[in-house]
Amino acid sequence: MKSSTTIITAYFDIGRGDWTANKGFREKLARSVDVYFSYFERLAALENEMIIFTSPDLKPRVEAIRNGKPTTVIVIDIKKKFRYIRSRIEKIQKDESFTNRLEPRQLKNPEYWSPEYVLVCNLKAYFVNKAINMGLVKTPLVAWIDFGYCHKPNVTRGLKIWDFPFDESKMHLFTIKKGLTVTSQQQVFDFMIGNHVYIIGGAIVGSQHKWKEFYKLVLESQKITLNNNIVDDDQGIFVMCYYKRPDLFNLNYLGRGKWFDLFRCFRSNTLGAKMQALRIFLSRK
């Protein structure tokens, strides 16, 4: 069985292994390169076609973990290619007119002080669009899944191949809270400043055509956010996208706080699995 979905992901070492509590960082924020690769090993066990963006030094390690499965690894120097936008992010993060709007407890979240973190989080649609434009995607559907999405061994639920008949006329975002209603751009900014999370950034699914639409929308939303002297990770940007084009999206509820239940809720095209997903949806309030 061949999946209808290509998985795209990326990993770049932004120094997160040094974000330890004894250095003043928030508890449980530190993750070394080795930890990230241990998470990736679980995702990499899937036999779906995968396209992975990384730095030149990490390419052999990615290829070794995939071990002959259909894989394309693309190397890129993000520090060089995106140095201007990184500098702009950093300038806003250090601007008191931005930081004074944040609650003190939010100041330790990396989206408010790490330009590398914000940059990498905001490149997901860029990476997918680049892979599509390079002609690397051969399947109808494309899924972005974070390199470190599989924190625990059972996240993929023992699947060998991940496949689900997502509606190709929509982009599919995944939520951990019900009731997202956005009525103004200012409300989106309030969500960003207050760190209100509805949409996760760890998984996004769409057809190749819809990804191109989504990429343009992401770029527009990122520019608006920066021009208003605000920075945020992908979660806030995706809320902005939803506000601007609600017709483009399906919001798929994973369950309250269930960040890592993608493969449980959307695991095959069989009737039984669909019924299981429906039961999960109805039971999670």
Swiss-Prot record:
InterPro entries attached to this UniProt entry: WlaTC/HtrL_glycosyltransf (IPR011735)
Pfam families: HtrL_YibB (PF09612)
Induction: Expressed in both exponential and stationary phases.
NCBIfam families (UniProt xref): HtrL_YibB, PRK11346.1
Name of this chain's protein: Protein HtrL
Species whose genome carries this gene: Escherichia coli (strain K12)
